[in-house]
Structure formats: C-alpha cells, structure tokens
Swiss-Prot record:
Organism of derivation: Shewanella oneidensis (strain ATCC 700550 / JCM 31522 / CIP 106686 / LMG 19005 / NCIMB 14063 / MR-1)
EC number: 3.5.1.88
Note accompanying the cofactor annotation: Binds 1 Fe(2+) ion.
Stated name of the protein: Peptide deformylase 3
EC supergroup of this enzyme: hydrolase
Amino acid sequence: MAVLDILTIPDERLKRKAQPVKDIEAIQGFIDDLIETMYHTDDGIGLASTQVGSTDAVIVIDLSETRDQPLVLVNPEIVEKSGEYVGEEGCLSIPGYRAKVTRFEKVKVTALDRQGKAIEIETDDFLAIVLQHEIDHLHGKVFIEHLSTLKQQIALKKVRKYA
C-alpha cells in the first residue's frame, strides 16, 4: 500500500469529474492506497478518488472511533434526498478552513462495494453529510462551492497561507 498525495485547491484536477469504474478487480490496489491515504491524515474521515488525481469513481469513509472500519463505495450515486441540514465542514483538499454548509438531511445512495456487490445506504445522520461531501468530489466540486464568492476567496487565501 502507498500513501498518495492529496490535491489542494486551486488544483484544477479537483474539478475533473470521475468516471464509472467498469473493472473493480483492476482497482483493488488503488482502493487499498485510498484507504491508507485517508488513515495517514490526522482527522480525515472520507476521501474521494478525485482528491488524489484519479478519475475512477470511488470514495472511502470511516466514521469509527478506531479508524479501522472503512466503507468503500464504487460508482456511488445519490438517488433520493430530502430535508435540510446546516453543519460545519472541512476538507483534506482545503486544509485549515472550515465553514457552515447546507446539505440534505437524508439521502439514499446506491453503489457497489469493493467486491462489486450492489449496496444501498439510506441515512439521516452524519454519514449523510459525509456521503454528499465525498460524492460532490466525484462531480468535480469542493464544499466551498456551496458558499458565497467572498467565503470561497477567504478559503483560498487560508490554503495558500497554510501551504
């Protein structure tokens, strides 16, 4: 396994849209690297493939206290959403910056697990927020795009100062 470099704004590769994975077996090593990279961070609870420069549609999430229960989702899609929730978010691609973001309170996501089995997740807790955040990355969006232009500029300045 390898720890991959996490891209930070304003890297244009973060704006690329992920493509559906057709051969899950071929990306097993990459999935391991993505998990290892997430665990290598101090406080990362999720990571999308596009954050490390890949266009394979894969996200990994681990909300466990022990950070040893990774959830791997290949080709995830939000198929239902409802409600509204405002909460503070941060991002490994925007180090040193947090802001309040409006998200859907409840989501239903379909995906494949790392063995290629179809799964469905319906949630209205913190996982719903993390799923939306990571799936946004697969669509070429970072969380600050949900904010005003002024707040986006502040985030960019903080990242440049942090670097």
